[in-house]
Design a protein with these regions (language model features):
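Conserved donor-binding/catalytic core segment of Leloir-type glycosyltransferases
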Residues: 81-103, 107-110
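Nucleotide-activated donor-binding/catalytic signature segment of Leloir-type glycosyltransferases, i.e.
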Residues: 123-130, 135-163
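Carbohydrate-associated surface elements
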Residues: 53, 71, 83
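Acceptor-binding helix/loop patch of EC 2.4 sugar-transfer enzymes
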Residues: 1-35
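Short acidic alpha-helix that forms the nucleotide-activated donor recognition element
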Residues: 39-42, 140, 158-169, 197
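Acidic donor-binding loop of glycosyltransferase active sites
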Residues: 45, 166-185
């Protein structure tokens, strides 16, 4: 959903030319993608989406837009309480940009709790299951807040491993953006619904 992004995070690869040329290419690419999408929407019998905000956007192109709610499959995910010796905060997924998912409040809280001698890295961990690009963003922010010693990074794991990882966690982390009229709209990560389980 291109309109939800604050910038150009929906483009999987950067162009790596001159900055002015990148901006021109991106603007043309966005316009072309939206035109193709909107043309397809106009001829669709029905359109479904998971965001009330997006329903309103898509109704501009097709009056038959339906809202479906996100969730989890109880046959694949059975909540358990597994005790561990550490307090573990877990995040699974991508972090495309700080405009969409921002860990700043978490990192500030960890820094404050460390300063107040409430937590130590040996018993308090934030575990990230992300791609390399996301890890780069997270590392930079963690270092900026002085909380890198609390972080653990892992590659993606098969979907079948996720329920056990979630069940071993003390807290499941859902990141979002701060509300601003110019920021992305309608984002609610599916991780939120996994967390509710």
């Amino acid at each position: 959903i291109i309109e939800q992004y604050a910038s150009n995070e929906y483009i999987s690869h950067k162009f790596h030319t001159f900055s002015w040329l990148d901006a021109f290419i991106t603007k043309r690419f966005r316009k072309r993608l939206l035109k193709k999408r909107n043309n397809a929407l106009e001829v669709a019998d029905c359109v479904t989406t998971v965001s009330p905000w997006h329903v309103e956007v898509l109704k501009q192109y097709n009056p038959n837009v339906r809202l479906i709610y996100n969730g989890f499959d109880p046959e694949l995910f059975y909540p358990q309480q597994i005790k561990t010796s550490r307090f573990i905060i877990t995040y699974t997924g991508r972090l495309l940009s700080l405009a969409i998912r921002n860990p700043e409040l978490l990192f500030a809280a960890i820094a404050r709790l460390t300063e107040d001698k409430v937590i130590i890295p040996e018993t308090f961990r934030v575990v990230w299951y992300t791609d390399q690009e996301s890890r780069s963003i997270i590392r930079q922010e963690a270092e900026r807040h002085g909380v890198q010693s609390f972080m653990d990074y892992h590659e993606y794991v098969p979907a079948s491993d996720i329920p056990l990882i979630l069940n071993k966690s003390s807290v499941l982390l859902s990141l979002t953006n701060k509300f601003d009229t110019s920021d992305p709209k309608g984002f609610m990560t599916t991780k939120f619904f996994e967390s509710l389980a």
